[in-house]
């Protein structure tokens, strides 16, 4: 079975209704038996492990021409996978997990990416894929014994490891979609149980994206409604030092997947499809600043 077919079968899990006499349970069982599963890890780390498995299924289907095709940031598919391995390795180093690839020199994302990409250019794409997956799996296994509140530092930012891992989940998801789009393939969305915590991270980042964009949201509150599987509602205090939300000043309603991708730097804020209410300039500022933390 083609790895992309396995992805589509996994996506069927999002629909709990199984028609009578459906062959879907047998198809899913067969697909799981033949695909490489997500690495065993803590429940809170499963969204990341799931995106790694999805990316690996996509990469398994790549042929020689795919690996040399430019995907994003001027990087080929092989260089993109090396970038993911570099950032996963930095997080692994922060929590004491094994670090694969070249010896650790630079400890920032851009520097480590450059080092790992240079190293992987001397190797085959399949070696790059295997080592990226091995790095991700080693991180997952290590996290199985850690509480989600364990402090971790990446690019000078110390937050609970769960938040860093959700950020890794979002980036892996987005870059898998980048690669699938370049190959003209439709990538199924993650299951709702994996989308929701990722969306929660995106909602909690909004005060920081506003601050980085030079906008002061102190004392103001956003009511955010994200629709679709994995969505929900959030009352978001828009000042980084605000401790609790107040009465909502602005309201934004948008698709949950599109919103996550906007935070990840995909899509133009000015053209983002959303319903706005209340303080419209504030709502527009939230959307304009949303991609501020995105990067390669």
Label the model's feature ranges.
Residues 51-53, 57, 65, 72-92, ...:
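Active-site-proximal cofactor/substrate-binding loop regions of enzyme domains
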Residues 36-59:
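Long amphipathic N-terminal alpha/beta scaffold segment
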Residues 51, 55, 113-149, 165-168, ...:
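Acidic/histidine-rich alpha-helical segments that form the ligand environment
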Residues 56, 88-92, 136-140, 144, ...:
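Structural signal for well-ordered, non-membrane alpha-helices
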């Amino acid at each position: 079975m083609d790895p992309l077919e396995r992805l589509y079968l996994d996506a069927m899990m999002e629909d709990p209704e199984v028609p009578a006499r459906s062959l879907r349970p047998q198809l899913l069982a067969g697909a799981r038996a033949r695909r490489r599963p997500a690495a065993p890890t803590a429940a809170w780390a499963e969204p990341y492990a799931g995106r790694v498995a999805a990316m690996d299924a996509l990469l398994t289907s790549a042929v020689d021409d795919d690996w040399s095709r430019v995907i994003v940031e001027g990087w080929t598919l092989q260089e993109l996978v090396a970038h993911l391995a570099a950032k996963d390795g930095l997080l692994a180093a922060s929590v004491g997990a094994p670090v694969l690839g070249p010896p650790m020199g630079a400890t920032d994302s851009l520097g480590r990416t450059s080092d790992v990409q240079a190293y992987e250019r001397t190797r085959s794409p399949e070696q790059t894929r295997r080592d990226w997956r091995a790095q991700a799996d080693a991180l997952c296994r290590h996290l199985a014994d850690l509480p989600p509140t364990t402090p971790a530092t990446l690019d000078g930012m110390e937050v609970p490891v769960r938040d860093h891992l959700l950020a890794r989940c979002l980036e892996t998801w987005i870059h898998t979609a980048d690669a699938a789009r370049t190959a003209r393939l439709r990538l199924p969305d993650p299951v709702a149980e994996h989308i929701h915590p990722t969306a929660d991270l995106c909602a909690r980042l909004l005060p920081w994206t506003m601050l980085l964009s030079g906008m002061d949201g102190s004392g103001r509150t956003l009511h955010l409604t994200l629709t679709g599987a994995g969505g929900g509602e959030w009352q978001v205090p828009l000042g980084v030092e605000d401790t609790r939300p107040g009465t909502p000043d602005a309201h934004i309603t948008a698709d949950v997947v599109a919103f996550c991708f906007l935070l990840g730097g995909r899509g133009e804020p000015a053209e983002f499809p959303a319903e706005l209410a209340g303080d419209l300039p504030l709502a527009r500022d939230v959307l304009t600043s949303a991609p501020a933390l995105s990067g390669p």
